[in-house]
């Protein structure tokens, strides 16, 4: 019923001499998300890792994205389909959204895509029912174990699982944390929870852990950040909001997603306590490199 599709994008742009010189500071990142478009949360950091640090970014997508049809009105003319019709959407939207995801990923420098195609039946806040009754939890766990074993990652990015957020986001994060916790302690990557400013900032500021899931508890050190308004280019006239906005624009089926285009935003990362305190210093160093590496 479920299938795994691994697609490898080979960039036509060679690594810069600066990136090559910093190879010992070139992290390998696995991003675990629930839907196509969730990756935009980490847009600027992914871009800096892949383009300034010479690192790599892979993405494991848990759902098929079929539930994201309600605001697809404008995309209908582009794709020649009434994507607001549930049956039409569930037939065609998963493939369309994968193409949109990979178009945005080409901008950010995402290398590999692992599609787990779990059912996306629409929005709910109950992550436990998703894990118990909707997704094939055993299958997802096995695939995440495999990716982590073969990927030799330094860091895993997840959405910070705040309570009012979509249940799929929280469920994907829980499964990612549990997968890392099953690894030998000497081989574990550091797993982080991320959230950009400008959305539910008051809730994010109070977050300690998701009720009922102590594995999601975070250290209050940090957050460790990258400001999308960081200037670069001729006369410093460019900044990394452009990267996020370009990625958002690729998700044309997600009409309300377009309203998140902006001229500011800070990507923030917290360390889950299951990593141990040593992970705080390593995360601080990695994000310092993300902030300061020449472009």
Predicted regions and their residues:
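Metal-dependent de-N-acetylase/amidase catalytic core
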Residues: 2-3, 20-32, 129-295
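Sec-dependent N-terminal signal peptides
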Residues: 4-12
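Hydrophobic side chains within alpha-helical segments
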Residues: 6, 40-42, 172
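A generic structural motif
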Residues: 8, 59-61, 190-196
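C-terminal segment of classical bacterial N-terminal signal peptides
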Residues: 11-19
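Active-site rim/loop-helix segments in enzyme catalytic domains that contact anionic ligands
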Residues: 20-151, 178
